């Protein structure tokens, strides 16, 4: 889960990372109030989860309250790379002597953590990495040892920060590591980390990505969810504990087990090449349980996707036998009633498959077609989706 800048700074403050004073608002009047409270020049910053805000006119210096109001009026509602600005961070403007870069992230390739640091901050780090790779230090972090002050200082040294700020930078870097570990983050980035004329170190910007798999032990993170920006279908799936990702195709997919669902996406995409280029509409894994309630929840999500023209239910019976899956499908269709209005192609295999197929045959639902193999089912689902386009 990506956080807005103001949310990242809330976590920074929680762990003692120094930042500029400020508050978030969603109105021009609120921007005026905050600017008046601060009583100094402020920065008015668009709160969107995308880079390049400054170039798009989403970050503006405001020397006085009137300027802050004018800038708030200009930024609210601004479209930045498809993200409409609905919130502003109004923060005290800081005098800047130098700008640095620091981040902690999960290094999946090497199965460890990675710190990155550079004396060249304030610009897109991808540009620095490409044009001057030697300016970006990459330091592996031992997951057991972590980052103490001494190691934090070595990170700052590797990034070639000036000697006179190494100690102050080390303190901030160590606290950023605490944010990374204690908040179960996948990324903590500060760009720029600034040095003020009196040698203070401040995190003027912040980017944090939280690991949603750790939500069970981070109850406070629920408050960071941006429900307005979340796809309503994904929100409905989450409320029903379904693993769902919306795609841009026409064939809805339901399967049990991530591996089977991924394989189903592949065969549907392949079959779609022969049927007008139709593609999978989603990833939906119902897990080990295929009860009527679970199946109804899954179908409810998929059938409410206007792009979906057909549904492919692909289940391998294991602990949950195929007859239970079949009863789940029949029960789900009864529960949904008229909402179930798109053709379903069902492929069952595994434990008690013959009984499962018998149950579906006896139900004789007009929308359900039972197919024996995955390839045939994918082809049929793609054909039906193409015909309905």
UniProtKB/Swiss-Prot annotation:
Record Gene3D superfamilies: ATP-grasp fold, A domain, ATP-grasp fold, B domain, Succinyl-CoA synthetase domains
Binding-site positions, substrate: 256, 318-320
Keywords assigned: ATP-binding, Ligase, Magnesium, Metal-binding, Nucleotide-binding, Tricarboxylic acid cycle
A GO biological-process term: tricarboxylic acid cycle
EC number: 6.2.1.5
Limits of the ATP-grasp domain: 9-236
NCBIfam families membership: PRK00696.1 (NF001913), sucCoAbeta (TIGR01016)
Name of the protein in question: Succinate--CoA ligase [ADP-forming] subunit beta
Species whose genome carries this gene: Rhodococcus erythropolis (strain PR4 / NBRC 100887)
Gene: sucC
């Amino acid at each position: 889960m990506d956080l807005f800048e103001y949310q990242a700074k809330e976590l920074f403050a929680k762990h003692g990372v120094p930042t500029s004073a400020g508050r978030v608002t969603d109105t021009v009047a609120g921007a005026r109030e905050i600017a008046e409270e601060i009583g100094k020049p402020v920065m008015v910053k668009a709160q969107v989860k995308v880079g390049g805000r400054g170039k798009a006119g989403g970050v503006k210096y405001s020397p006085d309250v009137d300027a802050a109001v004018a800038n708030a009026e200009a930024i609210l509602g601004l479209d930045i790379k498809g993200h409409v600005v609905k919130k502003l961070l109004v923060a005290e403007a800081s005098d800047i002597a130098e700008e640095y870069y620091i981040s902690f992230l999960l290094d999946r390739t090497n199965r460890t953590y990675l710190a990155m640091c550079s004396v060249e901050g304030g610009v897109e780090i991808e540009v620095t990495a490409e044009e001057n790779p030697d300016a970006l230090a990459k330091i592996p972090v031992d997951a057991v040892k972590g980052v103490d002050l001494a190691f934090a200082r070595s990170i700052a040294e590797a990034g070639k920060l000036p000697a006179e700020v190494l100690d102050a930078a080390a303190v901030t870097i160590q606290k950023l590591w605490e944010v990374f570990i204690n908040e179960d983050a996948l990324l903590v980035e500060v760009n720029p980390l600034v040095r003020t004329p009196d040698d203070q170190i401040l995190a003027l910007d912040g980017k944090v990505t939280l690991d949603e798999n750790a939500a069970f032990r981070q109850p406070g993170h629920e408050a960071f969810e941006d429900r307005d920006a979340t796809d309503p279908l994904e929100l409905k799936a989450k409320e029903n504990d379904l693993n769902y990702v919306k795609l841009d195709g026409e064939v809805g997919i339901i399967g049990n087990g991530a591996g089977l669902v991924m394989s189903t996406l592949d065969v549907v995409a392949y079959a779609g090449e022969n049927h007008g280029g139709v593609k999978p509409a989603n990833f939906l894994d119902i897990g080990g349980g295929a009860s009527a309630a679970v199946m109804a929840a899954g179908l409810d999500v998929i059938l409410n996707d206007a792009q979906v023209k057909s549904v492919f239910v692909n289940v391998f019976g294991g602990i949950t036998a195929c007859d239970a899956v079949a009863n789940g499908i029949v029960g789900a269709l009864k529960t949904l009633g008229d909402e179930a209005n798109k053709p379903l192609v069902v492929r069952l295999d595994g434990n008690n498959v013959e009984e499962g197929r018998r149950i579906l045959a006896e139900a004789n639902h007009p929308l359900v077609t039972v197919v024996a193999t995955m390839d045939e089912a994918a082809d049929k689902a793609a054909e039906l989706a193409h015909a309905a386009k």
